[in-house]
Amino acid sequence: GIHGYNHMPLCPDGFDFLGKVDYETWPTANDMRSAIAELMDFTKTLFPKNTISTYVPPSNILSAEGRAMLAESFPEIRTLSGVFLKEDYEYEQEFCVSDDGIVELPRIISGAILDPYMRWAAFNELNFQYVNSHFIHPDDVLDEDRGAALGWNTLRDNLDGYMDWLYGAAPGLRNQTAAEASRAVQRYDCLTVDRTLE
């Protein structure tokens, strides 16, 4: 998957970030399209055998205009991964297939700090849909807000401890890529219930 272009959310001029972040916006939908096209081309030069099918919005922010542009201009992007539980302006999702056919595959938790709220969210989602969806930035260990001050050993130990708990609590979970999990969401979304009373 891809995680935006220069970590800039796909948001047009005038998008309200509620004063929480200081991101630039895109002047036009065509500018957003050109940036993602450049990112897709660059990614294909690095990973020519891989198909990019997942878009993870930077800072979990995705405007309606940005989402529409992705759906219209990049048919290979079949999955969007925002968040299941939002705080402010984030792209909030359920596990489902949208009317335009794009699979909504939210993350439940992220990073390796794994505070009590994240553990609560993970526990609840295991009980609700028996899913663990976890996102890690490669640069988490370098970012103060995401744990760099704790150090690599602490972050690694946190993540190891979480994985030990997860596999102990939910041994039936399947390890899947976003593309594989997207197909599972498609199957889940198609489920129906029929009953016959006699």
Located regions from the model:
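Metal-dependent polysaccharide deacetylase catalytic core of the NodB/CE4 family, i.e.
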Residues: 1-65, 138
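Structural recognition of the beta-strand scaffold that forms the well-ordered cores
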Residues: 1-2, 53-57, 78-82, 104, ...
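Acidic (Asp/Glu)-rich catalytic clusters
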Residues: 1-5, 9, 94-98, 121-128
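Short conserved micro-motifs at the rims of enzyme active sites and ligand-binding pockets
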Residues: 11-13, 116, 144-147
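C-terminal domain-boundary segment and adjacent tail
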Residues: 44-47, 72-95, 136-198
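A short acidic, amphipathic alpha-helical/loop segment
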Residues: 66-70
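Alpha-helical scaffolding within the catalytic cores
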Residues: 86-94, 112-123
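Catalytic-face loop-and-helix region of soluble metabolic enzyme cores
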Residues: 102-114
